[in-house]
From Swiss-Prot:
<dbReference type="Pfam" id="PF00235">
    <property type="entry name" value="Profilin"/>
</dbReference>
<keyword id="KW-0206">Cytoskeleton</keyword>
<dbReference type="InterPro" id="IPR027310">
    <property type="entry name" value="Profilin_CS"/>
</dbReference>
<dbReference type="InterPro" id="IPR036140">
    <property type="entry name" value="PFN_sf"/>
</dbReference>
<dbReference type="InterPro" id="IPR048278">
    <property type="entry name" value="PFN"/>
</dbReference>
<comment type="function">
    <text>Binds to actin and affects the structure of the cytoskeleton. At high concentrations, profilin prevents the polymerization of actin, whereas it enhances it at low concentrations. By binding to PIP2, it inhibits the formation of IP3 and DG.</text>
</comment>
<protein>
    <recommendedName>
        <fullName>Profilin</fullName>
    </recommendedName>
</protein>
<dbReference type="InterPro" id="IPR005455">
    <property type="entry name" value="PFN_euk"/>
</dbReference>
<keyword id="KW-0009">Actin-binding</keyword>
<keyword id="KW-0963">Cytoplasm</keyword>
<dbReference type="GO" id="GO:0003785">
    <property type="term" value="F:actin monomer binding"/>
</dbReference>
<comment type="similarity">
    <text>Belongs to the profilin family.</text>
</comment>
<dbReference type="GO" id="GO:0005856">
    <property type="term" value="C:cytoskeleton"/>
</dbReference>
<comment type="subunit">
    <text>Occurs in many kinds of cells as a complex with monomeric actin in a 1:1 ratio.</text>
</comment>
<dbReference type="GO" id="GO:0005938">
    <property type="term" value="C:cell cortex"/>
</dbReference>
Amino acid sequence: MSGWDQYVQYLTANQQVEYGLILGKTDGTIWASNVGLTTLYNNYQIDVEGQKANVNETANLLAAMNNNGVPTDPLCGIRIMNQKYYTVKYDADSQVWYLKKDHGGACIAITNQALVIGTFDITKKQQNGVAQNPGQVNKVVESLAATLKQAGY
């Protein structure tokens, strides 16, 4: 287990987060993930309204982050693990990005060196039987990001 795995375990404890990831802010390298990823899904093709689009999730995510949460490739949009997300709010001051997808969403907190990502799916239950929800995901993601910022990350 890498030193970063404990942070992802914090995110996913009690099944409050569907997927937890920590990525390098500059290159998108996955530092830790609860799904064993070493990279986001890159270099695949999707069909959008009859048009083929090549997807590089890492590049698209970082480009949107640097564009205040607005995708720079509108055909691909923002995708995490081949699921399309839409920006609900990007708060540049607090460095938090809230996203929505069918039956769920994500919270991305940005630190000096990393992106802390937690996704949720309202059709999945936490350990306490309550559906995964944005409030809980936002709380754990933002809390972990604050801890990493204090540690210089």
